[in-house]
């Protein structure tokens, strides 16, 4: 801010600065004054902003108290209607959310099945093929064991 008083060479305190009582010592005093002014300006801004917020919070508190004072008798009178209505709305919202979630799950299952049946190899298709092979193997083992027991029963 004080750069416009310096010479064209951009040096520190020149001869003119010394005549005005400046020099290096005067420049330090000026910077100290500017720092103090900036601190005072910041403090004033913070106090103004903080005071405004304090006033607004007081007004909001007063408005809340007034609104509760007015609304409490109305809520007490209508509570036999409002409480069941709120419960019904909550149940309806839960039903819609559940329905939507199950619908999305069904669509994803149908999409996976379509990809699997058309041979596009969806995620976990290898696991399904492995499980299918193990199930078929176990079914053959059960069939062979049953056939063996039938043959033993007929042979005895």
UniProtKB/Swiss-Prot annotation:
Keywords: Acetylation, Lipid droplet, Membrane, Transmembrane, Transmembrane helix
Region (Disordered): 1-30
Residues annotated with N-acetylalanine modification: 2
Principal location listed in the UniProt entry: other
Amino acid composition bias (Gly residues), ranges on this chain: 8-25
InterPro entries, A to Z: Oleosin
Gene Ontology BP term (one): reproductive structure development
Protein's cellular compartments: Lipid droplet; Membrane
Hydrophobic as annotated region, ranges: 43-114
Residue ranges crossing the lipid bilayer per the database entry: 51-71, 95-115
UniProt topology in membrane: Multi-pass membrane protein
Source domain of life: Eukaryota
Chain spans, region Polar: 2-42
CC annotations in GO: membrane; monolayer-surrounded lipid storage body
Mod. after translation: The N-terminus is blocked.
Family: Belongs to the oleosin family.
Main function: May have a structural role to stabilize the lipid body during desiccation of the seed by preventing coalescence of the oil. Probably interacts with both lipid and phospholipid moieties of lipid bodies. May also provide recognition signals for specific lipase anchorage in lipolysis during seedling growth.
The protein's name: Oleosin Zm-I
Originating species: Zea mays
């Amino acid at each position: 801010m004080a750069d416009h008083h310096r010479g064209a060479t951009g040096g520190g305190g020149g001869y003119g600065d010394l005549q005005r009582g400046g020099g290096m010592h005067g420049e330090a005093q000026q910077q100290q004054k500017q720092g103090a002014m900036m601190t005072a300006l910041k403090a004033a801004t913070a106090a103004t902003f903080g005071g405004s917020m304090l006033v607004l919070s007081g007004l909001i508190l007063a408005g809340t108290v007034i609104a509760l004072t007015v609304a409490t008798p109305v809520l007490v009178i209508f509570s036999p209607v409002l409480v069941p209505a709120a419960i019904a709305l909550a149940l309806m919202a839960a039903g819609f959310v559940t329905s939507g979630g199950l619908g999305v799950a069904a669509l994803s299952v149908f999409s996976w099945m379509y990809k699997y049946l058309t041979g596009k190899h969806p995620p976990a298709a290898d696991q399904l093929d492995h499980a299918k092979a193990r199930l078929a193997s176990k079914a053959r083992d059960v069939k062979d064991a049953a056939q063996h027991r039938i043959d033993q029963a007929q042979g005895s």
